[in-house]
């Protein structure tokens, strides 16, 4: 009786394993879906906002780290700019409490900045200071 029970259990396990090879799994995506949604066609709010700034640093939506490319601005002046927003135009930065040296630095790099409306996707959670 024990031998019969072990043979039946073995046969049941083998049948289950073989059926898993025959039946399609639910995790495979259909080929037409892979072709339809692969590539650069998928975009989200953040991608659109990044494309909107055209390679410049957006004063309302950039983190402090984006200012590292400008010598003398990171981290002190960049922190002041990030915390001082939102801005309506680039020249609003000059209304901050900046030293003369910092104002000269900003004027030097002014053409590298732009202002777009603040986006909640880029400003949520105060990640602009330490986006680690």
From Swiss-Prot:
One of its GO terms (biological process) is photosynthesis. Pfam families: PsbU. GO terms for cellular component: extrinsic component of membrane; photosystem II oxygen evolving complex; plasma membrane-derived thylakoid membrane. It is a peripheral membrane protein. Keywords: Electron transport, Membrane, Photosynthesis, Photosystem II, Signal, Thylakoid, Transport. It is found in: Cellular thylakoid membrane. NCBIfam families: PRK02515.1. Belongs to the PsbU family. One of the extrinsic, lumenal subunits of photosystem II (PSII). PSII is a light-driven water plastoquinone oxidoreductase, using light energy to abstract electrons from H(2)O, generating a proton gradient subsequently used for ATP formation. The extrinsic proteins stabilize the structure of photosystem II oxygen-evolving complex (OEC), the ion environment of oxygen evolution and protect the OEC against heat-induced inactivation. PSII is composed of 1 copy each of membrane proteins PsbA, PsbB, PsbC, PsbD, PsbE, PsbF, PsbH, PsbI, PsbJ, PsbK, PsbL, PsbM, PsbT, PsbX, PsbY, PsbZ, Psb30/Ycf12, peripheral proteins PsbO, CyanoQ (PsbQ), PsbU, PsbV and a large number of cofactors. It forms dimeric complexes. This is Photosystem II extrinsic protein U.
């Amino acid at each position: 009786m024990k031998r019969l029970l072990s043979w039946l259990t073995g046969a049941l396990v083998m049948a289950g394993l073989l059926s898993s090879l025959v039946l399609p799994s639910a995790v495979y995506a259909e080929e037409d879906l892979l072709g339809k949604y692969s590539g650069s066609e998928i975009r989200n709010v953040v991608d659109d906002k990044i494309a909107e700034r055209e390679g410049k640093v957006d004063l309302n939506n950039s983190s402090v780290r984006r200012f590292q490319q400008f010598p003398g601005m990171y981290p002190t002046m960049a922190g002041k700019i990030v915390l001082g927003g939102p801005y309506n135009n680039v020249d609003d930065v000059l209304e901050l409490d900046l030293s003369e040296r910092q104002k000269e630095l900003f004027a030097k790099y002014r053409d590298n900045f732009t202002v777009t409306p603040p986006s909640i996707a880029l400003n949520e959670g105060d990640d602009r200071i330490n986006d680690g």
